[in-house]
């Protein structure tokens, strides 16, 4: 978000842009993640490779990322007997960019920084513990809260988790989920149920909420 930028046109490749007449104050498009959001598929490490190239030229500020990942670190310690979950949590930690700030190239006399912040809450829907933990690790890696259906599976799992993790989990009855506040959705399960969930999410008023749908056991979640 730019405030009071005395600019009527953005320089392509240097400054983010806001559309016709919107290059001053207001929300912006552009930046290192822009093109990736237009792709239907991509390598899982694509974002990390892009940022690594930039970080080699300019130092990265990751102080906030360290704080955001404390619940994820607690999950990793809890998963001492689950090597696959530990490895996946570490992978998500390395891929997640929430809490990072980078100085972007720009014209003399102007300072442009890119700061990536987490959304507030992510609805996670799964019908088995493995997928619920995959979703949990991904959401904690980016610093968000988890919204779980109030079911026996999720309640029992939450009781096993360390306090630092369970404090980041919220519950709602299944019939109340569409009316709850959440900013994104992660789903594991059958395609028919995914279609129904997408219809419910699309019928909500307000901002468009993205839904990531996966078959059971898949872990190639997009974290940005």
Regions found by a protein language model. Give the residues of each.
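C-terminal segments
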Residues: 1-125, 129-131, 135-224
């Amino acid at each position: 978000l730019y405030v009071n930028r005395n600019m009527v046109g953005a320089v392509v490749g240097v400054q983010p842009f806001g559309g016709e007449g919107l290059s001053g104050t207001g929300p912006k498009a552009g930046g290192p993640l822009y093109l990736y959001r237009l792709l239907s598929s991509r390598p899982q490490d694509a974002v990390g490779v892009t940022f690594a190239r930039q970080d080699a030229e300019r130092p990265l500020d990751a102080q906030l990322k360290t704080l955001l990942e404390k619940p994820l670190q607690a999950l990793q310690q809890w998963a001492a007997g689950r090597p696959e979950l530990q490895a996946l949590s570490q992978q998500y930690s390395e891929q997640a960019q929430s809490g990072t700030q980078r100085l972007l190239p720009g014209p003399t006399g102007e300072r442009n920084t890119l700061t990536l912040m987490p959304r507030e809450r992510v609805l996670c829907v799964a019908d088995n513990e493995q997928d619920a933990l995959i979703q949990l690790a991904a959401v904690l890696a980016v610093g968000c809260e988890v919204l779980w259906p109030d079911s026996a599976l999720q309640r029992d799992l939450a009781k096993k988790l360390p306090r630092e993790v369970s404090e980041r989990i919220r519950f709602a009855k299944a019939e109340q989920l569409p009316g709850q506040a959440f900013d994104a959705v992660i789903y594991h399960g059958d395609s028919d149920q995914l279609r129904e969930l997408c219809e419910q999410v699309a019928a909500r008023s307000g901002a468009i909420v993205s839904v990531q749908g996966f078959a059971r056991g898949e872990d190639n979640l997009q974290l940005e």
